[in-house]
């Protein structure tokens, strides 16, 4: 049965996607009221292009985070709505970098989006600069998420058996809470072990990996994709 685990998870995702598309088509068939004079209200700003809110940092050097996410998702036809967590001169794997914390600005952006009545089809989270930011994102998802909206979490914590600079054990704890809300998570091998409270192993068998994926999936996310394996 373990051999079919990933296939079953993919089938579950496809079923969810089909139901979502059916719901969208049904809504499009509903009669609409006569068009009103355009105005800059939340209702007017809504459109049929699927919106993805990307919660990530902006790094000046190193083509990562929002610098990579925005062009890729835009080329796929999505409207990418950045919720920046920090502005860095370079990503944290460089020996030196500046760091501008945007925690307070995140709150203001979310409050403004709520006033605008903005709807997001997908929530994608990446680098979070502090445990407090993880809590803000969790509250944001719980408040804005619709029944058919998707949550994708890239649990950025570390690599090669170690946490990234600036990432603490408290952050690991908050990330464990955040993945409970996710439909899909994409941890690398290091992050997989941290989320499971298991000692890091550089080499892992297929059977061990499948068991780890299943254990993590049982904690919330329907689909767990292990990267860097």
Question: Residue ranges of each PLM-predicted region?
Answer:
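Charge-rich, low-complexity alpha-helical coiled-coil segments
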Residues: 2-32
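Pocket-edge positions in alpha/beta enzyme catalytic cores
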Residues: 5, 98-101, 201
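A non-catalytic, amphipathic alpha-helix used as a structural packing/dimerization or gating element
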Residues: 8, 12-15, 105-108, 177, ...
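Terminal non-globular linear segments
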Residues: 29-47
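Conserved N-terminal subdomain of the carbohydrate kinase-like
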Residues: 44-153, 157-165
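Conserved phosphate/ATP/ADP-binding segment of small-molecule kinases
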Residues: 166-229
């Amino acid at each position: 049965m373990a051999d079919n685990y990933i296939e079953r998870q993919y089938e579950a995702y496809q079923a969810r996607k089909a139901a979502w598309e059916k719901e969208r088509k049904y809504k499009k068939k509903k009669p609409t009221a006569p068009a009103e004079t355009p105005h800059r209200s939340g209702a007017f700003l809504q459109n049929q292009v699927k919106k993805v809110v990307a919660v990530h940092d902006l790094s000046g050097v190193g083509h990562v985070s929002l610098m990579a996410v925005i062009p890729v998702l835009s080329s796929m036809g999505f409207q990418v709505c950045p919720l920046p967590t920090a502005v860095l001169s370079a990503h944290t794997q460089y020996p030196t970098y500046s760091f501008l914390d945007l925690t307070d600005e995140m709150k203001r952006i979310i409050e403004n989006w709520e006033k605008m009545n903005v709807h997001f089809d997908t929530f994608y989270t990446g680098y979070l600069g502090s445990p407090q930011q993880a809590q803000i994102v969790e509250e944001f998802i719980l408040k804005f998420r619709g029944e058919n909206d998707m949550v994708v979490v890239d649990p950025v914590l570390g690599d090669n058996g170690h946490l990234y600079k600036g990432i603490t054990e408290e952050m690991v704890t908050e990330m464990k809470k955040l993945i409970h809300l996710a439909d899909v998570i994409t941890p690398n091998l290091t992050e997989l072990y941290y989320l499971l409270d298991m000692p890091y192993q550089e080499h892992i068998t297929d059977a061990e990996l499948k068991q780890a994926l299943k254990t993590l999936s049982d904690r919330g996310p329907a689909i767990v994709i292990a990267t860097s394996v």
